[in-house]
Amino acid sequence: MTNQDSDQAWGKLVKVDASPGSEIVLINSECTVGRKKDCDLSFPANKLVSGNHCKITHDQNSGKVWLEDMSTNGTVINMSKVVKKQTHLLQNGDVIYFVYRKNEPEQNIAYVYQSITPQESASHDVEDAGREEDSDLTETESEPAPVEPVIVKPLPQSGHEDPQPSTSSSSLHFYNMPLSTCSDVSARKNPVSSSAVCKGDSTSSGSPAQTRLKWTCWTDGEPEEEMQRKRRKTDRDDPGFGSAHSDASADIPLRGASGKEKTEGATTDKMEESLTCIICQDLLYDCISVQPCMHTFCAACYSGWMERSSFCPTCRCPVERIRKNHILNNLVEAYLLQHPEKCRTEDDLRSMDARNKITQDMLQPKVERSFSDEEASSDYLFELSDNDSDISDMSQPYMMCRQCPGYRKELSSALWICESAQSESLAKTAGDGPSTSSDSTTAAPQEFRCPPQASHLICTCCLQPMPDRRFEHLPPQVSPQHCLVCQKPFCHVYWGCPRIGCHGCLARFSELNLNDKCLDGVFNGNQYESEVLQNYLSCRGMSWRHLLQDSLQALQQGLYHLSDYRITANSFLCYCCGLRTFRELAYKYRERIPPSELPDAVTNRPNCYWGRNCRTQVKAHHALKFNHICEQTRFKN
């Protein structure tokens, strides 16, 4: 801040629902607000405030004041939201919400902007000088020896109140309490440096920027033990705080005094944000990454989340695997070596270790896919042993299923399937497939046991292994472990798929469990033709199951012909291939409905040139105007 900028104040921000003396005087031509520590008005402990939330700019020529939003959540001015990269002309009396929560008013951070005329600014400076002079006289009587000033940073507020913002010392002034009260509190806390805290610029002989600093003391009448606890917490968050109290005569670099220091602080903040867990909002500890999205969290934090949801906390992508992120763990360790004050306490570390429910078995690689068109090879599951010594038994199979000797259930359960849900699903579907394998906890004998080094398949739905028994069926293409069309393996027919939400990933075509929405957009996304078919079925008390059975009967009689001649009513199809074949049969069924059984509005439409291949039939107007249950008649190769 130059001397020219500091000649007079042009505005001030008064905090809503605060003490009458709590105000922020704006002097610089540009004032920044955000969570970063180098902002003029900083809220470092409030995660609802963006790093660079907004900036308030004063035009010295026109005298106008503008607020430009740079945040993610936006800024609310007079109950009107200003989003990112938008500007708003501030008027005297405008209420600015840096944080606005309609259902959580205690989280709101609101200030009232008040413009200051040059006359008011001059009188304000005279009043400040009077306060400083009175403070100098009082401190001279009690402490004649000059002491270097010490900055006392604000202590965090207790309860649910908003954290008091820390401000840039070169642009903003706080008047939170009478100076006499500040002197009493400082003398009680630290008698050596009490006079320097409240004395202001009378004892400082430095640059003009230093001369205009007004040190502020903060207190809320709490007991000594509570104040000391909060001070220790502040020491961990800010390395400069502890050093300022330990040595009152140490030189304290002012923020903004050197451009290099400001750049280094911004870089440090960026690194800290990159190494912060979004769940606990602290530096990562024993971090893990979820796949396939690769977002990273503390192991203890994600353990609690994993019990409630199977989706990623950041992007809501389904989590398939969990892995240790060794690179980020090393980066966090290196960062803490340079910033030891940011380390967690021993109690926090012990608590996080106790809450960590991610076992070593969950971190082992579960699936390694290997697709080959030349070989009829399957997917392989690698079960890595905890013992890395040379005496480990290399003759063990790379994967284990329920029918392998030595199978243990807890080593094979999918990461996103709860143990109780899996047990319930296995018990319910124990007799669905040809295998009579039961839960590993029961003593019932099993008909099939995997031989050593047996080949296994990985279910496409639940990603769990099962024995490869395709060649026990002749021909192997009709195996109940594969879809006839896509040839992908599924375990539902074999022993029941345990994935939550699976209603039959593989079944005979006649027994396929399609839901009631299978008729929506059944004709290449043509909603109008789909509604015509649904109305026709509902008027006759029929559902999609009746349509499927009638179509399969016509297929068996040779009335219908599918593009894949291999498909019959007894063919094993996965859900996707079965739905695609069902839509093909639905078109055949709709095509054979007599026009006399359909409304006149349907039968009186002309045929579209493109017929069933029309790409415009998804538009409602075009679908209503033309009939698309016909073959293409123009531009046909």
Curated annotation (Swiss-Prot):
Zinc finger (RING-type): 277-316
UniProt keyword annotations, A-Z: Cell cycle, Cell division, Metal-binding, Mitosis, Nucleus, Transferase, Ubl conjugation pathway, Zinc, Zinc-finger
Skewed-composition ranges (Low complexity): 429-445
GO molecular function, one term: nucleotide binding
Biased composition (Basic and acidic residues): 258-267
Composition bias type Acidic residues, residue spans: 130-142
EC number: 2.3.2.27
Record has Cell division as a keyword: yes
GO BP of this protein: cell division; mitotic G2/M transition checkpoint; protein ubiquitination; ubiquitin-dependent protein catabolic process
Record Pfam families: FHA, zf-C3HC4_2, zf-CRD
InterPro entries given in the database record: CHFR_Znf-CRD, E3_ubiquitin-ligase_CHFR, FHA_dom, SMAD_FHA_dom_sf, Znf_RING, Znf_RING/FYVE/PHD, Znf_RING_CS
Chemical reaction(s) catalysed: S-ubiquitinyl-[E2 ubiquitin-conjugating enzyme]-L-cysteine + [acceptor protein]-L-lysine = [E2 ubiquitin-conjugating enzyme]-L-cysteine + N(6)-ubiquitinyl-[acceptor protein]-L-lysine
Location of the protein in the cell: Nucleus, PML body
Extent of Polar residues compositional bias: 193-210
Region of interest called Disordered, as start-end residue ranges on this chain: 120-172, 193-267, 428-447
PROSITE patterns documented for this protein: FHA_DOMAIN, ZF_RING_1, ZF_RING_2
ZnF locations on chain (PBZ-type): 606-628
Pathway: Protein modification; protein ubiquitination
GO cellular component: nucleus; PML body
Domain FHA: 31-82
Its job: E3 ubiquitin-protein ligase that functions in the antephase checkpoint by actively delaying passage into mitosis in response to microtubule poisons. Acts in early prophase before chromosome condensation, when the centrosome move apart from each other along the periphery of the nucleus. Probably involved in signaling the presence of mitotic stress caused by microtubule poisons by mediating the 'Lys-48'-linked ubiquitination of target proteins, leading to their degradation by the proteasome.
Protein family membership: Belongs to the CHFR family.
Notes on the domains: The PBZ-type zinc finger (also named CYR) mediates non-covalent poly(ADP-ribose)-binding. Poly(ADP-ribose)-binding is dependent on the presence of zinc and is required for its function in antephase checkpoint. The FHA domain plays a key role in the anti-proliferative properties of the protein and is involved in initiating a cell cycle arrest at G2/M.
Name recorded for this polypeptide: E3 ubiquitin-protein ligase CHFR
Organism: Danio rerio (Zebrafish)
Taxonomy of the source species: Eukaryota, Metazoa, Chordata, Craniata, Vertebrata
Gene responsible for this protein: chfr
